Regions:
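Active-site glycine-centered loops adjacent to acidic/histidine catalytic or metal-binding residues
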Residues: 310, 558, 671
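Cysteine-nucleophile active-site neighborhood
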Residues: 517-602
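Short glycine-/acidic-enriched loop or helix-start segments at secondary-structure transitions
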Residues: 263-264, 477, 522-524, 564-567, ...
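Amide-donor transfer/coupling interface in amidating biosynthetic enzymes
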Residues: 378, 501-503, 544-545, 578-707
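Short, well-ordered, mixed-charge alpha-helical segments that flank or form enzyme active sites
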Residues: 13-15, 208-210, 236, 562-566, ...
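A structural signal for short, well-ordered beta-strand segments and their strand-loop junctions
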Residues: 5, 254, 555-557, 667-668
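FAD-binding core of FAD-dependent oxidoreductases
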Residues: 313-316, 560-563, 615
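Glycine/proline-enriched, intrinsically flexible loops and inter-domain linkers
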Residues: 1-510, 514, 519, 532-544, ...
Length: 707
């Protein structure tokens, strides 16, 4: 898109337009347009806080750890992430969840810019409200630091200087001492960002964070700034996950980003023992921080980093545990004897820092020493499923799986409020039992050319297909690209085109009803969309004529599956059609689930028979309910696990997809069009890193071959 430099900002309080001949047709003082209102002057008194320092005992390490892992800021956020669509657009390269049991542990999110290239946009957040209670300036700097130690795991084009921040101020302003604290916090953020060499071009504020009650009680929210950091990703395939790679003997390295003494003030540990503390973590040297950020970026770009995680809420011990939680095997041997501080301070401090996993420390040590970055080699990956922590003569052994259940428990308690006790308990009981596993077809090479796919195709193939859209759907673009990749020339057909007669589908051999929320699901899933076909003569005629032909294929995904079921398009010979009911959990479900493809004669899925794959689900009404016995249906795909959440909706016989008796018409709830590239999978077989496409692309290639 064209971009033009049309002017510059000055401090002359005037709006000036200069012509090419150096004349000045417009030269207005801003006061002529906006008046000259008086400047607002806020007067406040600085209040000096005096919080109790922390007192702790090494002997209570396990007690402290259990309480910290249950703290909402530290505990599992599964109850939040499982109810929002994390795959829509098909451009999600990294979302919250990672690993074979898909736990929400990722440091950042990444959206691909398109389906062909490697570039993307990364975003991460940081906040530090408890630190800011003690020290508004330090807490605000820590918020920026946390956002950046989360963002650093994506290879940012231009490194730190190319990052932009957004600042969202949440503050109980206009209360005694709070305006003064806010002023100091804003000033600290401004200076820190300038010293880092990054900009804050946008943000917002909510300065009424005070709750007053009829009995006279007043509650202040802790003043904090929530920082969102954004940067362009050079290669989405090189982003680093916190999940430890199962490489025995690989090393774990602690890298300091703060250049500051280790402090426990404002920490999660302080909260669980009901003390704030006097001294908080801080970043002593912005240039040092920037240097550490850019050095780690280089190591990531050079392929030296296997896994990595920031240290923030919960401290170093939480970081180490979380790096193990999303796996089901292996552990760590950790030795922190090189730290001068005591065991509790080392393991629970939240100073800005990271832990990385590397195969060989040689290059990492050389780079960090050359740049003057403080680091310590603290351990290695071991086979026993535990974390062994040594500090001088002390040794503590942590049961990773037991502590993971404790960490997940808070999510389970909160989930009861939305899924109900039964299904919240099912999720809590089964999350660790429903590990993702794969059995790819033996013929699948992962190479695009082996399927006749030209990844950069521009010319027409002459084989027409159509996306059928209704207002509210949102899965059309990823579906269109999957079809295009397979070799179709894809036409965009909206329901208004069919209703008005502009399209009649006579030149189309393959139609796809896409996913989303047609008509906002106001009438129920796809009920309004079905009505648009049933009660509009031209649309109904076009649909009936299409299905009367013997040379046609159709696919319905998610909302499209609900539509095909509502219209009875899969089994028109049945007097009573299947129904799509609300999920048994009574809420929207989003997840990456295992699927077994049964032996079948479906045009699109036949040569994937016997496979175990995985893809995204995102629906609120995905439960197949069948009026007849099992043998009356061609159930081509099932959820690999019969119980929730592996079967996310409670479908009869764990059904995920059905097809017509002749194999030409397929309806499925999972989104195969959001997983045709390996980078779209949040967990892909580790021995298939060279794959260009995933097995799901074969469904579209099969459709093209048949047509």
């Amino acid at each position: 898109a064209p971009i033009y430099n049309v002017g510059e900002v000055k401090d002359n309080q005037a709006f000036v337009i200069e012509a090419d001949d150096e004349s000045c047709p417009v030269d207005l003082k801003l006061e002529y347009m906006f008046g000259k209102p008086p400047k607002t002057v806020l007067t406040d008194i600085s209040e000096k806080s005096n919080f109790d320092d922390l007192y702790f005992e090494d002997s209570k390490f396990n007690e402290y750890l259990t309480d910290v892992l249950r703290l909402e800021a530290v505990a599992c956020k599964d109850w939040l992430t499982n109810k929002v669509d994390r795959s829509v657009t098909g451009k999600v390269a990294m979302q919250q969840c990672t690993g074979p049991i898909q736990l929400p542990l990722n440091n950042l999110g990444i959206m691909a810019l398109d389906y062909q290239g490697k570039k993307g946009i990364a975003t991460a957040i940081g906040h530090s409200p408890v630190n800011a209670l003690i020290n508004a300036e330090a807490g605000s700097r820590i918020a920026i630091a946390e956002s950046l130690t989360n963002l650093v795991w994506a290879p940012i084009k231009g490194k730190l200087s190319a990052v932009s921040l957004s600042a969202n101020w949440m503050w109980p302003a206009k209360n005694k001492g709070e305006n003064a604290r806010l002023y100091r916090a804003v000033e600290a953020v401004s200076k820190f960002a300038i010293e880092l060499g990054i900009n804050i071009p946008t943000g917002k504020d909510s300065l009424s964070m005070t709750q007053k009650y009829p009995d006279g009680n007043v509650v202040y929210a802790p003043g904090t700034v929530i920082i969102s950091a954004v940067g362009e990703v050079a290669d989405i395939n090189n982003a680093i996950s916190p999940r430890i790679q199962t490489k025995l003997g690989s090393k774990l390295v602690y890298i300091d980003f703060s250049s500051h003494s280790l402090e426990l003030g404002g920490s999660s540990l302080g909260q669980v023992i009901n003390r704030l503390g006097k001294k908080t973590p801080d970043v002593s040297d912005a240039k040092y921080f920037a240097n550490a950020f850019n050095t780690l970026q280089k190591l990531i770009t050079d392929g030296e980093i296997l896994a990595g995680h920031d240290i923030s809420s919960g401290g170093l011990v939480t970081t180490l545990l979380e790096m193990n939680f999303s796996n089901t095997e292996f552990g760590m041997s950790i030795d922190i004897s090189d730290f001068n501080e005591d065991l509790i301070t080392v393991m629970f401090n939240e100073n800005p820092a990271v832990v990385v996993q590397v195969n060989d420390t040689t290059k990492l040590e050389k780079e960090l020493k050359a740049k003057g970055i403080n680091f310590k080699i603290i351990g290695s990956v071991i086979e026993p499923r535990m974390i062994s922590i040594t500090k001088d003569s002390k040794n503590i052994k942590l049961d990773v799986d037991r502590l993971r259940d404790i960490w997940f428990e808070s999510s389970y308690i909160l989930d009861q409020k939305q899924s109900g006790p039964q299904y919240a308990h099912c999720r809590y009981k089964n999350y660790r039992r429903q590990e993702l596993s794969f059995d790819f077809p033996s013929h699948f090479s992962g190479k695009a050319k082996d399927f006749g796919i030209n990844l950069s195709r521009r010319e027409r193939s002459g084989i027409k297909a159509a996306i059928i859209r209704e207002k509210g759907v949102n899965g059309d673009r990823e579906m269109a690209y999957a079809m295009h990749l397979a070799g179709f020339d894809v036409k965009d057909v909206h329901m208004t085109d069919l209703i008005n007669g502009r399209e009649d589908l006579s030149d189309i051999s393959f139609i796809v009803f896409v996913g989303g929320f047609s008509n906002s699901d106001v009438l129920g899933s796809a009920k309004g969309w079905a009505g648009a076909f049933l009660y509009n003569e031209k649309a109904k005629k076009a649909l009936d004529s299409f299905y009367a032909r013997n040379d046609t294929l159709s696919l319905g995904v998610c909302n499209g599956c609900q539509l095909m079921t509502e219209l009875g398009l899969i089994y028109p010979e049945h007097p009573e059609k299947p129904k799509m009911l609300h999920n048994d959990s009574h809420k929207f479900e989003s997840g990456f689930v295992n699927l077994d493809i049964n032996e079948n004669k479906s045009v699109m899925l036949a040569n994937l028979s016997g496979s175990r794959l995985a893809t995204w689900i995102a629906h609120g009404e995905g439960k197949f309910s069948f009026p007849y016995f099992h043998d009356q249906y061609n159930i081509v795909m099932k959820y690999s696990y019969d119980v929730y959440p592996g079967n996310p909706n409670g479908s009869d016989w764990s059904t995920a997809a059905i097809c017509s008796n002749d194999g030409r018409h397929l309806a499925m709830m999972p989104h195969l069009e959001r997983a045709f590239f390996p980078w779209q999978w949040p967990y892909y077989p580790e021995d298939r890193k060279d794959d260009e496409v995933s097995p799901w692309i074969e469904a579209f290639v099969n459709a093209k071959k048949w047509v």
